[in-house]
Regions:
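Conserved donor NDP-sugar-binding/catalytic core segment of glycosyltransferases
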Residues: 101-134
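Glycine-rich, basic loop-to-helix element that forms the pyrophosphate-binding segment
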Residues: 69-85, 106
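A conserved acidic beta->alpha catalytic loop
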Residues: 22, 39-48, 71, 97
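Short, acidic, metal-binding catalytic loop of nucleotide-sugar glycosyltransferases
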Residues: 21-32
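Short aromatic/hydrophobic "clamp" motif used to bind/position activated sugar donors
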Residues: 90
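Short beta-strand/loop segment that forms part of the nucleotide-sugar
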Residues: 32-41, 65-68
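Cell-envelope/extracellular polymer assembly enzymes that use nucleotide-activated donors
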Residues: 2-4, 34
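Short, flexible, basic/aromatic active-site loop/helix in glycosyltransferases
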Residues: 120-127, 136-159
Length: 159
């Protein structure tokens, strides 16, 4: 199964290398993966980190692409990613998350067993304890905030 890994980022220079490293370390065949990275017009060095990942791993994965999201918002970033992905399934991961090295392979097994949507636990890391960041952490720790994989007719329904 050809998998698209998607990360949407905005001003994540202090966290983005962690998830990019986790993507690079996946035990799933990299020739069956593409990585779609979307930068929301970051004002820090996030885009440079994404470009460095692309340059370093462009020959390791089937495809690595860095896209711009001038509207900056997360929903707009996902629209950019959804227009670009080529895989049979999309795996969404957050820019400030960590995933185990078997995250993709476990999700693929579930999808290949007949499920249309699956996900997995992954810790979300916050860089400082503030009421707002703790609220976001709580939301992202829920089922609806977690990383998910989807296969099916998303292109026809949501484009």
């Amino acid at each position: 199964m050809f998998i698209t890994m998607c990360v949407i980022a905005y001003n994540e220079e202090n966290a983005i290398d962690r998830i990019l490293g986790d993507i690079a370390a996946q035990d799933y065949n990299h020739n069956d993966m593409e990585v779609v990275l979307v930068d929301g017009a970051s004002t820090d060095n996030t885009k440079k980190h994404l470009d460095n990942f692309k340059e370093k791993y462009k020959d390791d994965f089937r495809r690595v692409v860095v896209l711009d999201n001038p509207k900056r918002t997360l929903p707009s970033g996902w629209n950019v990613a959804l227009r670009e992905y080529k895989g049979d399934a999309i795996i969404k991961v957050d820019a400030h998350a960590e995933i185990p090295k078997d995250f993709v392979s476990k999700n693929v097994r579930v999808l290949e067993s007949g499920e249309d949507i699956c996900g997995g636990q992954r810790p979300v890391i916050i860089d400082e304890e503030t009421p707002w960041k703790n609220t976001l952490l709580l939301a992202e720790s829920s089922m609806f905030g977690s990383s998910i994989a989807h296969t099916g007719t998303i292109r026809e329904k949501h484009m």
